[in-house]
Each structure stands twice: as structure tokens, then as C-alpha cells.
């Protein structure tokens, strides 16, 4: 009897020891594992478990009523008591390895070989994690059960200037735009923003221009206009419109204005503060109150033919030793720049004139409507006078 009581006592002791170990393992799961363990991927955990000599002693916590399938046996889940379920230190941590099967659900076991099945298992595991673990303890950095992390697309992310976080999917689209005076007409861009001439080009351009001016004060400009007459007869018709004296006076006036513009431009080629205001204003003057004021309307494409005539004349300026490729490139840049600025001024003035005409039409229509309403009211008042009763 003494031996039997001893055996029973030892047996009882073993049972109680196993129960305490079982209870301690559950406490280890909830107390020993730190908060950052939920952010550790399953691959890293498996690598650390494979490096250690002993197998993992902690059994994962599963959902109530769910069993996990181990090779050769079924182990019931470890359910936390109400004390741990209601505690603030509850942390969900999965200690599954690659040798263990996924969490068993109500649906039949799926084959994990295909990517579609793996995604379905991952979705069920993530749903189970949200059901068991409080939302405040779920790590922000989530990984799928395969352990792979999807790096954010840094190429398609743009940091907001007013906010501290980044907005994914917003691509920064920066476009290099040339300065425009449509938004603010009083601000004109500088010349150096458009013309990028080298010092040798500036030197040869000034030298050839002075040589052409020595032949006559207005000779370079007059030769350019006469050459443009052969490019397009409309240019000749507009400048020489009217009597012979009127045409020559108009040609002389154009040559004087063009010479002044070219003198200012060539003198300020290397000036950082020189603007294109003079060229824009010259282009604006080609918008006339009457469309056919000088025989035919002025079009912007006529300036292209004027540029061709000017380039042909620049090749003849200067001494023969100065007519180099450097000089020709410098003059070509200047001619194209001048015609482009004249076009800009002409087109801006056209838009402004159209807006003014539209406003005049609307104001005229509203005034006529007011006049008609006033006449109707006066007729009604006269109808109720004593004379008509």
C-alpha cells in the first residue's frame, strides 16, 4: 500500500507538473515574447529556429475551437484565459515554421503549391489575425505568410510640400516652360534667357553690324525690306500702299524703327538686365484697327519670309575675313530671336483686341436690351395717362 500510494503520489506529481508546464508555456507565449515580435517575418523566425539545436518549445496560439495538424498527431490549441484575453499586453505572434501546416479552417485543406491557394491561405490567416488580436497590437508593417515584403514604389512617390507624409501614385511632372507675358503683360523676359551666344559670336556680330552701318545709317534695314519684297508681294503691297511718296515715307519709317531696335539689341547682347519689351511692342503695332488698312491683312507667317531675307543680307555684311561660320551662326540665332519676339507681340495684341471686341458686343447687346425695356415701360406708362383714358 505504501508503494502504491507512492506511485500514485508520483503520478499525481507528474500530472500536476505537466499541467503547470502547460500553463507556463501559455504564459511564456504572452509574457516573454516582446511587442516587436509581431513584425518578425516567418522566414526569419524559421531561420533562427533552424540554427538552434532544440526545437521550438512554444506552441502557437490558435483561434478557439481550432486544431492544428502536426505530423502523426493532433494537438489541441492553447486558449488564453480571460485574464490574458482582457489584458492590454496581449500580443499575437505566430511561431509556425515551414514544416508545419497552416491554420486549419472550416474549408478542406488546400494545396499550397499554387500561388492562388497560397494567397487564399494568407487571406484567411490575416482575417484570423484581425479576429484574435486587438487592432492596436497589429503591426503596421504586415507581411504575408511567405515572408516576402513588397517594397514601395519610390519612383512613383512625391513628397507633398504642405504635408509631412508622402502620397503614393502621384508622379511629379515638371515641365520647362519659357517665360510668357500673357499672365502679366508688364513683366518682359530678359534677352539672355533666349539668346545663348558665345563671346566670339557676340564679337563678330557687333563687328559686322558696325561695318554695315558705315555704308549708310539706314542701308542695312532698307536692303532687308527690299529683299523681303521679292520673297512675298504682300509685304511690298502693305509697305508701299498709297501714293509713291507715302510708300517711300512708310519704308523709311520702318527702316528707322528697325535700325533702333537692332542697335539696342546688339549693344545689350551680354547685358543681364536687357528685356524684349521693344521687340514685343513693335510686334503689337502690326495689329491694325481695320483689317485691310494697308491693302491686305498682316499675317504672322510674313515674318518668316522677312527672316529669310534678313539672313541673306547678313551674309554680305562685314569684311571677307569676318564672314566665318561663327559669325553666320550668331546672326542666325539673332534673326530667329527677333522674328519670334515680333510674333509673340503680334499674337498677344491680337488676342487682346478680340477680347475687347467681344466685350463691346456684349455691352452693346445689353444696352440695346435696356433701351427696349425702357421704351416698353414708357409706352405702358403713357397708356395709363389721363389722355388715353
Swiss-Prot record:
Note: Does not bind carbon monoxide (CO), nitric oxide (NO) or CN(-).
Keyword tags: Heme, Iron, Metal-binding, Oxygen transport, Transport
Species assigned in the record: Caenorhabditis elegans
Single GO BP term: oxygen transport
Molecular function terms from GO: heme binding; iron ion binding; oxygen binding; oxygen carrier activity
InterPro entries listed in its UniProt record: Globin (IPR000971), Globin-like_OT (IPR050532), Globin-like_sf (IPR009050), Globin/Proto (IPR012292), Mb-like_M (IPR044399)
Region (Disordered): 1-38, 96-123, 143-185, 367-389
Ranges annotated as biased composition (Polar residues): 1-15
Domain Globin positions: 196-347
Family assignment from sequence similarity: Belongs to the globin family.
CDD domains (alphabetical): Mb-like
Biological function: May play a role as physiological sensor for oxygen via redox signaling and/or electron transport.
Binding site for heme b: 254, 286
Basic and acidic residues: compositionally biased ranges: 376-389
Protein name listed in UniProt: Globin-like protein 6
Pfam families for this protein: Globin
PROSITE patterns xrefs: GLOBIN
Induction of expression: By anoxia.
Compositionally biased spans, kind Basic residues: 16-25
Tissue specificity note: Expressed in the head and tail neurons and nerve cord.
Gene transcribed to yield this protein: glb-6
Disulphides: none
